[in-house]
A protein has these predicted regions:
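Membrane-interface extramembranous regions at the lipid-water interface
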Residues: 3-59, 66-145, 161-189
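Extracellular/periplasmic helix-loop-helix junctions in multi-pass membrane proteins
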Residues: 146-159
């Protein structure tokens, strides 16, 4: 077997040997709790909405923080799954996948880059373009915009919508039978 990126043995990918997928319902729950708490706070304190840089109360801050941390746990888990696919060399380590989310500005590019690398695997497994990484990247970008301009909870829900699409594509790719070894995955562009 060749060690170059994109090589996969003819053996079947057995999902039970891979780490479990992230539990996205937890992220949805945190996001919805955050949105509800934010709307309740805004209705009880309407003057806070008029401030130029409103500072959230501690309970809202903690919900935002926990949601963001859980999002990073999910990103780490996706890349850990990809790292452990037999014969597949995933170019992004789990730590790097999480770390680049902290680089202001670069994280916007990163929200398009890492789904593209996962899409290469998914599309290679199907032998055709099935996963569109631009869709995931746009959902992540919309989530950032929602988070900063409207409501952090709704932004978090949008992040997990993108993750649901990504999970669905990965699950379908892992459910396929074995494929013969090909030289490179198809382009996602």
């Amino acid at each position: 077997m060749d060690d170059s990126p994109g090589e996969l043995a003819t053996e079947d990918i057995q999902p039970e040997k891979l780490p479990p997928f992230p539990q996205l319902w937890i992220g949805y729950l945190i996001g919805l709790a955050n949105a509800v708490a934010g709307f309740v706070y805004a209705s009880l304190h309407p003057q806070a909405a008029k401030e130029e840089f409103p500072i959230p109360p501690l309970y809202l801050f903690l919900l935002i923080f926990v949601g963001w941390v859980y999002w990073l746990v999910c990103v780490y888990r996706y890349h850990e799954i990809m790292r452990r696919v037999p014969g597949w060399k995933h170019p992004i380590s789990p730590a790097r996948a999480v770390g680049f989310h902290f680089l202001l500005g670069y994280n916007l590019y990163w929200s398009f880059k890492w789904p593209r690398e996962i899409a290469k695997f998914v599309n290679w497994r199907f032998g055709k373009i099935v996963m569109k990484p631009e869709m995931v990247g746009l959902m992540f970008l919309a989530a950032y915009v929602l988070h900063f301009l409207f409501d952090p909870g709704l932004g978090l829900v949008m992040l997990f919508l993108g993750a649901s699409y990504l999970s669905g594509c990965l699950r379908r790719a892992f459910a396929l039978g074995p494929l013969p070894t090909l030289s490179t995955p198809p382009s996602t562009e």
